[in-house]
């Protein structure tokens, strides 16, 4: 029996979600390029499921882009490129002439936002990236976390991880941050809340294990997870 797609899963659970009185719990993790956002998400998933006897927590990262790729018959690379792209009259005109089935950036971002909101409302979700904080800014019973670090620290980490020199690592950071600039502006407009995140950590000072411990304490104090058993 084929495993249901994320879209099918969400559709199948819409009735259950509509009956749910309270959203969450959920956690969103935003990160600067070069920080341990993905690794932190994996570690948090492990720690959260240690607190949950039913091990209901799941992590969502590239799964959303993968699902949209499967739904549209496109590659994840095309979906990601369009998600980051700015509106273009010429591109939209050509898209209309070709009757292109490729969704534009606006459609892709809206679909991802809907997925994120649905997942967060259903609860027991660790959402890494994908504009999670902006998409869930008005949904209760969640915590939004941001991981940052000085540029030099991120350059050193990328240099080691990718086995490249620091100049190349710096160029990678510039390229990624330039691509994300437009997306970040849209997220700021979508979520004008100040501060934008519940917690912000300096990854150069706190390791992922230390950050996770602080997040667990915060989630416990907010009633999102049960106290640790003694």
Language-model features, listed with the residues they occupy:
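Glycine-rich phosphate-binding loop of ATP-dependent small-molecule kinases
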Residues: 1-102, 110, 114, 118-124, ...
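Conserved nucleotide-binding/hydrolysis micro-motifs of P-loop NTPases
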Residues: 65, 132-134, 148-154, 206-207
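Alpha-helical transmembrane segments and their cytosolic interface
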Residues: 207-211, 215-216
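Conserved phosphate-donor/acceptor-positioning beta-strand/loop module used by diverse small-molecule
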Residues: 138-162, 166-174
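Structural recognition of the conserved hydrophobic beta-strand(s) that form the central parallel beta-sheet
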Residues: 125-129
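Small/polar loops that bind or transfer phosphate-bearing groups
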Residues: 60, 146, 203-204
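Small-molecule kinase domains that catalyze NTP-dependent phosphoryl transfer to phosphate-bearing small molecules
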Residues: 4-17, 87-91, 165-208
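Short, flexible loop segments at the rims of nucleotide/cofactor-binding pockets, characterized by
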Residues: 102-106, 179
